[in-house]
Amino acid sequence: MTYRLEPAMMYMMPIHFGPGMGPRQGPQRRTFECKDSPKTTSVSVSFLTNGEQLETLLPEGFELGAEPVVTVYASYMKEIEWLAGRGYNVLGVTFPVEFNGTVDQAKGNFLTVLWENLTDPILTGREQLGFSKIYCELPDPLTFEGDTHCT
């Protein structure tokens, strides 16, 4: 007996495992309200660098945006509804770019790499959004004597 794909459902590979649950689709096609979640703490640092070095990271059609400023950011998310109240941490590196295609133009941040410390959001983000994500250990920040430390 063969299986039939349900058009309104979201699938991840391999599709014969059935519809995939994740942040954009819960059980019985339920969407998540995320009214008071996630609880997020974010930190970042930005620095001016050599634009020619950044340009070597860009695919064809992209060019460096305003200034060659790299931003390294970390976000620590807790109480995420689609993760049954669990959370995860991310660390990303971005810089401003412009895309000037024959039809479309856009300005934004180019995400060079994104590290995460939980498999569920890595798989769903890669499969459903096309983000290239890498697993790594990202401990929560520690606060000691009024100073917050991220390692």
Residue ranges and their predicted role:
Residues 1-10, 25-34, 67-151:
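Short basic (Lys/Arg) and small-residue
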Residues 11, 15-25:
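Terminal interaction module
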Residues 14, 59, 129-131:
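Glycine-centered flexibility motif
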Residues 14, 50, 118-119:
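Alpha-helix initiation/capping motif
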Residues 22-76:
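N-terminal ordered "arm"
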